[in-house]
Amino acid sequence: ATGQTGATAPVTFTKDIAPILQRSCQNCHQPNSVAPMSLITYEEVRPWARAIKVRTSLGPVADVMPPWYIEKDVGVQHYLFDPSLSDEELDKITRWVDNGAPRGNPADLPPSRPLGGSSLWAAGEPDLITVTEEFFVPGDAADWWGDIEMTPIGNTEDRYVASVEVHEVNDVLNADDNPADRATVGGRFVVHHMIWITQVLDDDGEIVDSTFWPVHEVGRNADTFDPEGARLLAANSRLVSDSLHLHSNGR
């Protein structure tokens, strides 16, 4: 008797697809996170099987999944935390969907990855958390670009920053008072991106220190700086948005 191997082996969720989702999708597609649906369990993934095939096989253009826009044949190709899919992984997804998206043997399912949604700090529990003002975006609102009020960081002394991470918060409830409801358009959060800096002002309101930080986009990983090149956060800094883009999520 001969077993099925290589390209002829059946592709299953537990053995083949779950590891792909864990590595490349579940950073956003988990409960209470940015994506419009969770893709953790087979029951969650199965209704989206055809959509997953389509969204992962569109090619290197905007809006493909996972969002990773590095050109495959130009420049540096080896990046930490690269979520892009290989040709082999894309082939597995296609074969799995075309074969009816079978579940497979539960024993093949890999251990689950740590889940925390938007409350999980990728770089560990922070030493300092700064909370900006709240925004309410109506369900039928047009896109908005602007600035937010200066927000005191809360540091009373100069500090070198090892890592910085921005989290969005969505506290809009559905009819059942469930903040995890995902019936939205394009995701749970209304933030698209924010260009931000920190500044120190003197008693006359004049800028005496200014530091630029990595632009924030929804789903962005924490930015960790080299120990030899950490950024200085001056005492009594304030967070200043140079440009904030908000959009409705349909709720």
Please tell me what each predicted stretch does:
Residues 1-151, 163-167, 236-242:
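Aromatic- and Gly/Pro-enriched helix-to-coil junctions and flexible linker segments
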Residues 114-251:
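His-enriched metal-coordination microenvironments in redox/metal-binding proteins
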